[in-house]
Amino acid sequence: MRPDSLVMAAPEGSLRKRKVGGAEHSPASQPSLARDPADSPARLHTGTFWLTRIVLLRALAFIYFVAFLVAFNQNKALIGDRGLLPCKLYLKNVQEYFQGSTGWAAWTYAPTIMWLLDWSDMNFNLDLIALLGLGISSFVLVTGCANMILMTALWALYMSLVNVGQIWYSFGWESQLLETGFLGIFLSPLWTLSRLPKNTPTSQIVLWGFRWLIFRIMLGAGLIKVRGDKCWLDLTCMDFHYETQPVPNPIAYYLHRSPWWFHRFETLSNHFVELLVPFFLFLGRRMRILHGVLQILFQVILIISGNLSFLNWLTIVPSLACFDDAALGFLFPSGPQGLKKQVLEIQREDTQRVQPKPRDRGCLVRQVVNISLGILVAWLSVPVVINLLSSRQIMNTSFNPLRIVNTYGAFGSVTKERTEVILQGTVSPNASAPDAVWEDYEFKCKPGDPWRQPCLISPYHYRLDWLMWFAAFQTYEQNEWILHLAGKLLAGDSEALALLAVNPFEGRTPPRWIRGEHYRYKFSLPGGQHATQGKWWIRKRIGPYFPPLRLEDLKEYFKTREWPLPEPPSRHTR
């Protein structure tokens, strides 16, 4: 896949345009009795969404937890004080662009609470934001309890990271999480942490906001394919996908060797799920549930077949809005104190009430808020719908600074061969010497050593590994951070080395030279000669990616970019 067309990973521009849709709040239709899927004596009604809200909030909290865990583990080395692209330097550049001001213009360009914090220790700020996010998301995940305050905090914290993360946070799933999280704010009651807040039933507007989101995600992904690479029309894209996806897993190794007819079936199934199934949302309860089941199964298959970060896990979240309490009852235990019993009591009270329940001021305010949300989402959806209908459709783009409603798409084109950048170092005084021994650095997950088994890490992901995949399609001049990484490896920088799996110079003097080599990779044939030798990959050198460099060669390069020159260990002399 080309990096500029990969939907879930395509980097967005520095100036982001941002956008979603909505629906009007309306009272639930007269509920009908349905046999509880858990086969308990209680009969849960259709048409209510108390349990749906709990499942949605827990699922969203899980994604937030993974996202903040990735941030806590990787941000310091990527955007910290001495990171590959320091966020302090980025914010200073934004400030200078707006004549040294941190006013409204700077806030709307890069909405982040970093503007309010002390920049003298950005590593502390980054860890603080990540730990707060981990703490709040853990609470919601474990308890199923949330209110608007907690969900707003999660959304604001993650948005603060995304808007200073630069290219490391330019993947499509960042905007998708922010849009999903924004809807999650209005899914919750304002103050109470009750899992079943009787005065705050789940809003139909918010539910339709989630349904509108999954509709756009899937239809956008389907349309970008049929408008993009012709292999989606001649049904051959899956012949290449498993081998050339950003970070393959072991299952992809075997799926790649599936019969040709199976790959054709996969492609046709993809078109069915992405182009036709989304319209099931508008065909009543049964078809909506069928839509939810098909979309979740589709995402599970994608999760099994590749390390696509938490993208597919995240896409499951809005699909949950297709199910009501009767459909999700099987997820909850039965019992006199169980949630199903409590929901049944609420349903009975509603059905037995002769007069409509009087609404207090809080309920009326909440209804106004929900209607306002629907109007906002509908308004922001206008350019998104225009984009969907356009023959020049773009994906993973936002039309507003808060990324409330966005465009989506995936794999608009598929690359037909896999290339990788391999970083190598040597302690030889002369990089051109025939006897110079070059040793490979190994990344956490991206292909490198042909004998190393592909990793299995979804929903976790390594941002550096993903960017290395993009770098292989471009030049090092287009990816200045890769030379920053090379400089840090030359100095034996511990933060940079923590981003890698294997440092060939561990316990030794750092290398004198670093170079980048460009290789073509192919899966070995299961049962073939290379596979029997233990190789998962066959690789062939294409040529140099960047020439051999010493730390002193990078001094001017670092100076012009205001990067501090890494200091080699005192025991190391050159």
UniProtKB/Swiss-Prot annotation:
The record ties this protein, via InterPro entries, to:
LMF
Major location (coarse): endoplasmic reticulum
Q: Where is this region: Disordered?
A: 1-39
One Pfam family recorded for the sequence: LMF1_C
Q: Kindly state the tissue distribution recorded for this protein.
A: Expressed in all tissues synthesizing lipoprotein lipase (Lpl) and hepatic lipase (Lipc), including adipose tissue, skeletal muscle, heart, and liver. Expressed at higher levels in tissues that express little or no lipase activity such as testis and pancreas suggesting additional functions in these tissues.
Q: Where in the cell is it found?
A: Endoplasmic reticulum membrane
- Those parts of the protein on the Lumenal side are 73-127, 222-292, 389-574
Which stretches are transmembrane?
50-72, 128-151, 208-221, 293-321, 368-388
Q: What does this protein do?
A: Involved in the maturation of specific proteins in the endoplasmic reticulum. Required for maturation and transport of active lipoprotein lipase (LPL) through the secretory pathway. Each LMF1 molecule chaperones 50 or more molecules of LPL.
What protein family does this chain belong to? Belongs to the lipase maturation factor family.
Q: Which disease is it linked to?
A: Defects in Lmf1 are the cause of combined lipase deficiency (cld). Cld is characterized by severe hypertriglyceridemia with accumulation of chylomicrons that gradually pack the lumina of capillaries and sinusoids. Severe hypertriglyceridemia causes an increase in blood viscosity, ischemia, and cyanosis, and the inability of tissues to access circulating triglycerides results in starvation, poor thermoregulation, and death 2 to 3 days after birth.
- What this protein is called in its record is Lipase maturation factor 1
Q: Which gene encodes it?
A: Lmf1
